[in-house]
Each structure stands twice: as C-alpha cells, then as structure tokens.
Amino acid sequence: SVEQIVELPVVATIIEDHLVKGAIDILDVRFGSLWTSITREEFYKLEPEFGDRFEVTIYHADMLVYQNQVVYGKSFADVRIGQPILYINSLYRLGLAINQGSFAKAYNVGVGSSWTIEIKKIEG
C-alpha cells in the first residue's frame, strides 16, 4: 500500500530569442550523459544544424556549475574523444555528453528541478 504521494515540481521549458532553458531530468548512469527536459521540438525552435555551436550553461539553484561552447552533433563521432556534444537522445530529448567520458562525473552535475540548463545559439 502507498502511504503518501509526493508531487515533484516540473520545470517548464522556456523559449526566448536564440535561447532554450530547461531542467536536467535524468543521468544516464551507464555513460554519464545528461538528459534534459528540453524536447526535440523545443530545441528545433533554435533552428540547429549539425555542427552548430551552442553556449551551454548549467546551474544548481543559482550557482554556475558549467559554461562552455558545445557542438550539436548527429553522433558522438562528430566530436573528438573527451569533447562535449549536444545530441537528441532516444526519448527525443536534448542530451549532453562527453565523447567516451562521463559528463556528470567530470562536472559533478546532478538531476532534479534545482538543476537547470540553458542552451544559447552562437551566431556566425
């Protein structure tokens, strides 16, 4: 029997000019990839092309945890070993990973509504 049901807050995706904000929902523990709440359709509002660079910023509460330029790729082969990559995962959500590494371990990133991610298209 269930004694109590706890509702968890859902972080809504915010779409602004050249920027999408969401939450880090899942850590793929086998590979250390981050799976975000940002859907493929939401990310496509930025009109990404494979090979485009994005400024990726991760916050835990209000603390900056990670900020770097990351390539949007079709597969991990699109970046060198040890480099970060943005990709669409099997759930049609935006993922962030390190080729042959653990993004979660490298930057001590967790999951939940207090972990947010911003993806900003770099023009040019």
What does each model-found stretch correspond to?
Residues 1-50:
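Anionic-ligand-binding alpha/beta catalytic cores of soluble enzymes and soluble regulatory domains
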Residues 3, 92, 103, 113-115:
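Generic hydrophobic/packing signal
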Residues 12, 51-52, 58, 121-123:
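Short acidic/glycine-rich loops and adjacent helix/strand connectors
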Residues 19-25, 80-85, 115:
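Short small/polar-residue motifs
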Residues 27, 37, 59, 118-120:
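A structural detector for beta-sheet-dominated domains
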Residues 34-108:
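A conserved acidic, glycine/proline-rich C-terminal tail/linker
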Residues 105-124:
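Conserved glycine-rich phosphate/nucleotide-binding loop
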